[in-house]
Structure formats: structure tokens, C-alpha cells
């Protein structure tokens, strides 16, 4: 028999979904597990080894019915015995409706499905929601992400023994999710005096912030545009600390076991989606413009020793 799991995005959610896929795999030993996801996450999920096959969903506009129907026919023809909807979006509810007459057992939030988990009426962390969803079919608590499959050689970066990660970026279209670069720099300088070298992480879109931090904290090491997902996980395993905005790389770093402080504004709700673990601290202000360097430093978790 074959099992379909659906998880489209985004990076942080994909990291949080890894324990779910691991639990589904254990619950269905010997069955063929297929993941329906989007192109940016195919490589990550292949490397995880948690699924046997990956389908890419282009997520066409729902009015482009021809493309949507091709996917629906593919799902029907595969003869899945069960579908785990780990996305829980309007799109995946629509997929369920389009499968009328030939539906596999569906575990999700689509009204009328075999194992229905209602959408929460109050803020609930996605991990808890999915834990309850899987419990409907007898799957035990999936636990936390394990990124042991993400390994890389970070010796090429020439980092000192004691370093910390600064992740000042975020979605370009949501600038309110970013703590000001000058405060990242000020915090970096404070921690530099305590023996931790700041290492700057980001993409091309964050080049401006990282350049500003580097100017104000010249001893920081600039790795902008140089790190893969595997690099981030490996850097996180060896870093003493990490501090960053609510962005995908912080999910990877925190999931690697790095003591982490994640910063939130009114733009996102850490009660719904945030890294998990005893080594993770969350700090929120209505506006990150109002978060002082002193308050951020006070909120840091204990640094990893050695």
C-alpha cells in the first residue's frame, strides 16, 4: 500500500514537519511513503530519507483547472490508502473535495474527512496541532526535529573555536520582522568582549543589513550567501549561541541544538509557529524597534561551553 503526506512550505514549517514524517514512517512500516511538496524543499526531503518518493506540486492557481486535475488524477491513480494533510490549507481542502468519489482515508482539517482535526479557535502551536492530528490515528507524540542527516564540512570557513551566529534577515516584504542592524552589531560587540566571535548569516537580500553589522563590528565574520541548509545545521551544532529574527534559518539552527534567541514582532505569532526545545528562547515586542540591546542580551539562553 502507499501513503501520501502533503506539506508544501515554508522552511520553518518543513523543519517542524520532520518529526511528523518520521512518526508516519514508523506507523506504516514497509509501506511506500510519498510526499507532495514544492520545489524549494525537494532536496531537503530527499536527504532526510523519511520518504520513498517525492512529488512536486506547482500549486497552480485554482482556476487553472487543467493543471489541478492532472494532480488529482495522479493522486487517484496512485491508489493511496491514506493521506496525511500536514499543510491544512484552503488548497489542500480543495484537493480533498476534488477527490470526491475516490477518496482515500484523509487525516486533516477538510470537513467531512475520515479523521478530522478542526482548525483551532485560539492560538495553538503547529507542533501541538499536528500532534493531535496524528493521535487521531494512533500515532504517538512525534517529538522534536532531528537534523542529523544534515552534515557539512565547515572547516572551509576558518572559524574560531568560540563563535555565535547572528541571523539579521527575514522576508523582504515584511521588514517589521527585522530587528535593526545596528542593534545586532551592538550585541555582537558585547558578546565579542565575552569571547564569542559573531558570524553573520544571510542571503543576498540581507546584504545591506549584514554590511551594516560588519561595518559596526569589524571582527564579525561575514558568511552572507555562503551557507547551505546543511552548513546552517552544522554551524548550529558547534556554535555557542545564535540570535536572529523569525526566519527559516533560525529554525534550522535551533533544531540543530544550538542555544538560540528568536525575535518576534507583531508580524508573527510565536504561539503558532516557532522553534521548539529547552535551549530556545523567544522574545517578542509589538515593534522590534522598541527592543533594546540590553533586553536582548538579558534574554539570551546560557551559551554552549567548550
What are these regions, as identified by a protein language model?
Residues 1-306:
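Catalytic machinery of carbohydrate-active enzymes
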Amino acid at each position: 500500500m502507499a501513503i501520501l503526506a502533503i506539506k508544501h512550505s515554508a522552511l520553518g514549517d518543513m523543519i517542524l514537519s520532520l518529526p511528523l514524517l518520521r512518526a508516519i514512517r514508523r506507523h506504516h512500516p514497509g509501506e511506500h511513503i510519498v510526499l507532495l511538496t514544492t520545489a524549494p524543499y525537494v532536496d531537503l526531503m530527499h536527504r532526510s530519507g523519511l520518504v520513498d518518493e517525492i512529488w512536486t506540486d506547482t500549486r497552480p492557481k485554482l482556476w487553472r483547472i487543467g493543471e489541478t486535475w492532472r494532480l488529482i488524477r495522479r493522486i487517484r491513480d496512485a491508489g493511496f490508502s491514506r493521506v496525511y494533510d500536514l499543510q491544512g490549507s484552503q488548497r489542500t481542502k480543495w484537493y480533498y473535495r476534488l477527490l470526491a468519489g475516490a477518496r482515500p482515508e484523509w487525516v486533516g482539517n477538510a470537513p467531512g474527512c475520515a479523521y478530522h482535526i478542526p482548525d483551532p479557535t485560539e492560538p495553538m502551536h503547529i507542533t501541538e496541532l499536528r500532534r493531535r492530528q496524528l493521535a487521531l490515528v494512533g500515532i504517538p507524540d512525534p517529538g522534536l526535529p532531528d537534523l542529523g542527516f544534515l552534515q557539512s564540512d565547515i572547516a572551509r570557513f576558518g572559524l574560531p573555536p568560540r563563535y555565535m551566529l547572528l541571523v539579521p534577515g527575514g522576508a523582504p516584504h515584511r521588514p517589521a520582522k527585522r530587528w535593526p542592524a545596528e542593534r545586532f552589531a551592538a550585541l555582537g560587540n558585547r558578546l565579542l568582549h565575552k569571547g564569542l566571535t559573531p558570524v553573520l548569516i544571510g542571503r543576498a537580500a540581507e546584504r545591506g543589513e549584514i554590511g551594516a553589522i560588519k561595518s559596526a563590528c569589524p571582527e564579525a565574520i561575514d558568511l552572507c550567501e555562503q551557507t547551505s541548509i546543511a552548513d546552517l545545521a552544522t554551524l548550529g551544532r558547534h556554535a555557542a549561541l545564535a540570535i536572529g529574527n523569525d526566519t527559516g534559518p533560525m529554525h534550522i539552527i535551533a533544531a540543530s541544538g544550538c542555544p538560540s534567541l528568536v525575535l518576534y514582532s507583531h508580524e508573527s505569532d510565536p504561539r503558532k509557529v516557532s522553534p521548539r526545545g529547552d535551549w530556545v528562547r523567544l522574545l517578542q515586542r509589538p515593534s522590534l524597534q522598541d527592543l533594546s540591546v540590553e533586553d536582548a542580551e538579558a534574554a539570551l539562553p546560557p551559551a554552549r561551553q567548550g
